[in-house]
Amino acid sequence: MYPVSDAFLRAVRSNTRKYFWTGTIVTRGGMTYEFGAKEIVKGSGYISRQCCGSTEIELGTVYAAEMGITLLSDIDRYTLEDAQVTLVFHLVLADGSVEDVPMGVFEVSEANRLAKCLELKAYDFMLRFDKSFNGFETVGTAYDFIALCCKRCKVEFANKRAEID
């Protein structure tokens, strides 16, 4: 969970609220593209989370997020292979200030051009764990095993040893 203020929680619970989204796309080549509410096609954005790929419970699955968004943009779709999209939700509070909540970093899996629009589909880093791994290669604590998995899958590990051991 991301910590938010009491004012944020009150604003979310109110009958009406003002909010907007912004984001950044960083290509493999290092090009950075910023986008905001003006570039996002209204009603096109979503973030959905799912644990299993089917209707049955499967062992070894992860809780992954999919992000989709359509942008009014002339970015060349071919430059977006494996690009990273960072999304931020901005909520306007009762006093007029804005509180930001980072919504995650996603890797682009599909980029399609529709006239003047760029349609993106991306997944969070949890899908990086979808690979074969021999867990018997290591000996150690739970922390050591998780840290090794994160390193091999190139996923940042945010926990401290004391939180896990």
Regions from the language model: what does each represent?
Residues 1-80, 116, 121-129, 135:
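Juxtamembrane "anchor/assembly" segments of surface/extracellular structural proteins
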Residues 32, 98-103:
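Short, mixed charged/polar active-site loops
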Residues 43, 93-99:
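Intrinsically disordered, low-complexity coil segments
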Residues 54, 72, 90-92, 104-107:
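Short alpha-helical segments and helix-capping/turn motifs at coil-helix boundaries
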Residues 78-95:
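Short coil-to-beta transition motif at edge beta-strands of beta-rich domains
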Residues 97, 112-165:
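Charged- and aromatic-enriched interaction segments used to assemble
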Residues 101-113:
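Short beta-strand-centered aromatic/proline hotspots
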